[in-house]
Every structure is written in structure tokens, then in C-alpha cells.
Amino acid sequence: VMNFLLIRMPLGFLRVRPANFVFTGGVKSNIKDPLITDKTEIVPIHTLDYDELLKGRFDSAVKFDYITFVDQDLPQHSDLISSSKPALVSKKKYYKELNEFFNYLECKYKVPVIVALHPRADLIKAKENFLGRSIFSLKTNALIKNTLFTIVHYSNAVNYCVLYKKPFVLITTNEIEAAHDNRTAAIRVLESFFSREVINLSSKEYLTKPLSIDFDTESYSQYMRDYIKNNNDDIEFWDVVAKTIKF
């Protein structure tokens, strides 16, 4: 309720001045906000993800072919602790369905599935949940750069797939679909934008439907323009910020 009221209060009443600058990462960046007025300077910039591409800060986490799963810690996400929301999925069922899918992929492609662990996930519990598979924390960038393809639900890690022109497979489960919330909506958005068919692990659709592990150059380029980089400058993010706001 407080957030609802605060958003609708005039800035002058709250003694808050409009923003001097807003940095936008793509043509679809949302710049509708009470803090943005006709006095605010809109500065095109790329996302911080693109800085990683510029700096070349990529260490090969492993030296052989593999498939990357981007973990989002859905059964025990730390955000649930401070909210009244129930877990999106049940732990036992979720990891059972995931590991069955991973077993299938490892058999089909003859390479291991490794896990890009959610940064706030428990590493010890993850080892158990993923049946001893290789797990890497804070290595999502490097893992996707060198991967055969990536498995995601609705993660921002899709940015890395686009940057490195790597295919990705969208997955869901019956429990995720039953939620009908912003997370399921995010999956649908990615499905529509990239024309990717979402694989439902609960119904084991991967056993009968061929997985698409290629990518559409046009949709990747469009995503880059819309959400990552809207100009031709290759100046690093913080250099642009410093140059813009210097007094």
C-alpha cells in the first residue's frame, strides 16, 4: 500500500528532484518513471554485460564441450524468505525432472551438463540436488561463452547467449506453468521474441520433440538493439557514465 501511494505522490511533496540523467541500454528501455521529466537527459549506453565482451574477461571454466544449465534456485530462492510467496516449484519434483532431462541430454550429445549456480544458492545443497554434477558459481559469462548450448527458464543470462551467439533451450514444468505469474510470463516473452518452443520437462516433451540448438541471427540482432546496445560506441559503461556526469 505504501509503495502504491509513494509512486503516485508528486515529487515536490516528497522533496525529491527529477533525475538529471538516465542511462538506457536499448531502444526498448523503459524510461517511463516519475523521476524522469523533460529536464532529464536520456543517455544511450550498453548494458554492463556488453562490457565483459569489450574487456575480454573470459576464463575458460572447463576445456571440453559441455551444456550449461543456468540455475535460478527456484525451490528455495532467497527472495522467498522475505516475502509471503510460496516456492514456485517443489524441491523433490523439480530436481527429479531436471536431472532426468540432463541425463537425456548427456546420453544424446555425449557431453556433460554443468551448472551455472545462482549466486545466492547453497553450493553444498546444490551438489546434492544436481547429483554431483560440476557446479560453478559466478562463472555464467565464461560458461556460456564456451558452451555447446544453454538451458534456461527466464534468466537474464540470455544476454550472454545473444552476445556470444550461442543457442539456448527454454524449459518449464507443470508447476511453473500453474503459477501464472510474472515468471511464467517471462518465459512466454522469450518464447515469442526468439520463436523458440518451450520444452515442458514434466511431460517429457524432449523425448518426442526435436530440440532446436541453433539460433536465428535476425532475432539475436534485434534483441541486441532492443535490450543490450543501441549505438555503435564501444566505450565501457562506467567511462560513459563518468564522462556524462562530470562537473
In which residue ranges do the predicted regions lie?
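A nucleotide-sugar donor-handling region in carbohydrate enzymes
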Residues: 2-84, 219, 244-247
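A short helix->loop->beta-strand "cap" motif at the edges of active sites that frequently abuts
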Residues: 19, 39-40, 110-111, 165-167
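Hydrophobic/aromatic beta-strand patches that form the interior of the parallel beta-sheet core
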Residues: 21-23, 43, 68, 114, ...
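Short, charged/polar "capping" segments at the starts of alpha-helices
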Residues: 29-34, 53, 77, 120-127, ...
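Donor nucleotide-activated moiety binding/catalytic core segment of transferases
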Residues: 47-49, 54-55, 96-99, 112-164, ...
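Conserved catalytic-core segment of nucleotide-activated headgroup transferases in glycan assembly
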Residues: 50-124
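Catalytic binding pocket for nucleotide-activated donors in carbohydrate/polymer assembly enzymes
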Residues: 127-130, 156-232
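C-terminal alpha-helical cap of glycosyltransferases
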Residues: 228-247
